[in-house]
């Protein structure tokens, strides 16, 4: 390793090699669209954007999961396959530098998702235990799949399920969405003609009306969102406002989000919740229970692992388990990861490839090492 790498880098790469991963390097300059489309609002606003001579929008690499997946697709490598990386990422941050090191593993193509999920948590825990010897670690797990299964079982329409799923991982967004669900805002800001078209769900008529208004105002329909996109969003918002959840269903959703228990009792807590609310969580609960058993089989300290039903991570591509690991009593995560079974298909893979992975923040780890007595 050159001197620009953190002192712990060599030990991390040895661990990666011992865990049967393929070391991969990806370009610092990346096409921006995959990140803008799939990475989530929190990361999107932190990206450093630029433009190529041909007009393509590019960005400095803000994370590794998407570039590693793109590299896998272009290489046409077989699966299952485990990739490891260690390098710099670039994000606008309120604290710390805008350029910092991350390391991690992306585990692609293993159809035994419970075992792959457990292995990812165990890999992250082993890495942190290696570089922070003697430090007590706390693991927090959430599950996007369980959350979406609860929303479906409650009978929420697709638009609301999508909005709440996008908000999962951001406490302010989730609270705002729940507030709107409890008390839908009135649609009083639209003019009479637009309001009528929205109420009728007339996508073509509304698109034509918006296009005419943009033309009169001298606005280019190609400069931003198209008239059809704007019309579709207005109609979707109106449909969301028309839904009011029953008091019983809303109480059930709030009760679900309040579940926060040790992992060894989490499946039982979810079963109790579902039975009390009269809901069937089906395959999502079966997957959850299988994963919990697989994690325990890795010998991780069960008393340090907790399931938080309201816990998510602010990246749009997660579909299942999500997790973070922090020093016991610490406020900032040292590692974070999760499952992203739709991501590779969205990036262009010809067949569905399941994936799960994690990354660690080396600057945060270094700060803890330096502060140790």
From Swiss-Prot:
The keyword Amino-acid biosynthesis is annotated on this UniProt entry: yes
CC per GO annotation: cytoplasm
Gene Ontology BP terms: histidyl-tRNA aminoacylation; L-histidine biosynthetic process
Keywords: Amino-acid biosynthesis, Cytoplasm, Histidine biosynthesis
Main localization of the protein described in the UniProt heading: cytoplasm
One of the Pfam families matching this protein, by short name: tRNA-synt_His
Pathway named in the protein's UniProt entry: Amino-acid biosynthesis; L-histidine biosynthesis; L-histidine from 5-phospho-alpha-D-ribose 1-diphosphate: step 1/9
GO terms for MF: histidine-tRNA ligase activity
InterPro entries for the chain: aa-tRNA-synth_II/BPL/LPL, HisRS-like_core, HisRS/HisZ, HisZ
Subcellular location: Cytoplasm
Description of how the protein assembles with itself and partners: Heteromultimer composed of HisG and HisZ subunits.
Note: This function is generally fulfilled by the C-terminal part of HisG, which is missing in some bacteria such as this one.
UniProt family annotation: Belongs to the class-II aminoacyl-tRNA synthetase family. HisZ subfamily.
Chain's role: Required for the first step of histidine biosynthesis. May allow the feedback regulation of ATP phosphoribosyltransferase activity by histidine.
Name recorded for this polypeptide: ATP phosphoribosyltransferase regulatory subunit
Organism field: Mesorhizobium japonicum (strain LMG 29417 / CECT 9101 / MAFF 303099)
